[in-house]
Amino acid sequence: MGSWTSDPAPPMAEVFNSAVAAVAIGAAWEVGLLDAVKDQKKVDVFQFAAENDLDRPSVQGLVAALAVVQVVALEQNTVVAGRQLEEAYRTKSLFHWLCLGSGGLFSRMQYVLRNEHRTGDFHRRDPAAIAHACHDINKQYFDPAFWAAMDGLDYPVQSVVDLGCGSGQRLMQILDRHPQASAIGIDVAGPAIQVAARDAVARGFGNRLVFREGDAREVSYRDEFEHVDLLTCFMMGHDFWPRDKCIATLQRLRRVFPAARRLLLGDATRILLDTPGGQQAVRNGTVPIFTLGFEVGHAMMGVYLPTIDEWEGVFAEGGWRCVKKHLIESLSLSVVFELEHA
């Protein structure tokens, strides 16, 4: 081996170090270190560990990982902002989604690659961590387009259902802005909606917001759906696919929510894998943040990710009409569709 020098790390060392740092960014956000450095400017490592009941050597390791990629800088035992802190903070939930929420999937890549293992419930992710990350992803990337669509509605919202509601934060924001409205959140992840229900009660929405555990793709008519006039669905529309199933799901939503005047459907779309010659396709040297993890992760789970063109090709058969499309280019290539009954 060569001697230790101050030369830049070779490419594979950068890849290795970045893999550790990616986990560290998600963890640092969850334990509050990123916010502490951002807000306080200087954080004593030992004091932070003691105040938050964290193992001191592990926190020192966490800080070292962040320092290697210049998210923070370490001055003796004091952590200060590094050159990449602002960008890391802006994208923190993407790292959390990848490494904490989906870590159980990626750490078993060698297992899920084998067809002999791809039966039944062959992969694991952390639904509560996914919900936590998706709340911030929605806030950072989808909210501007979502609220533009909400502000453009030409009717007063009375009853809203969020399909794949996760933490329920979107519904609570809607209820804040529309005090006359009530809401229902539907999600297949029981742990996520248990947290959401407790949060809703704590924030005073207990009599206006309820949560139902269930698969949004298989939802059946209930009396409480009769007057729902707004449907929202973010970061789970790809679960409707492949095409025939997506059309069937859209038709089902059309029947189950007969009074819905708008369906706001937002999701990231496929731009990397199996997109030869596609108008929005990217190549290896231009892959944006999130795209690789999002597309590879869903490929391993056996979930089909549609392109924008494929989405636009199912609305009519599904019983909906697209009245407006909001593109979001800061998160892979994402979109918010405004749909109405055809």
Swiss-Prot record:
GO terms for molecular function: methyltransferase activity. Keywords: Methyltransferase, S-adenosyl-L-methionine, Transferase. Pathway: Secondary metabolite biosynthesis. Gene3D superfamilies: Vaccinia Virus protein VP39, Winged helix-like DNA-binding domain superfamily/Winged helix DNA-binding domain. It holds the Pfam family Methyltransf_25. InterPro entries: Methyltransf_25, SAM-dependent_MTases_sf, WH-like_DNA-bd_sf. Its EC number is 2.1.1.-. Belongs to the methyltransferase superfamily. This is Methyltransferase ungE'. It comes from Aspergillus campestris (strain IBT 28561).
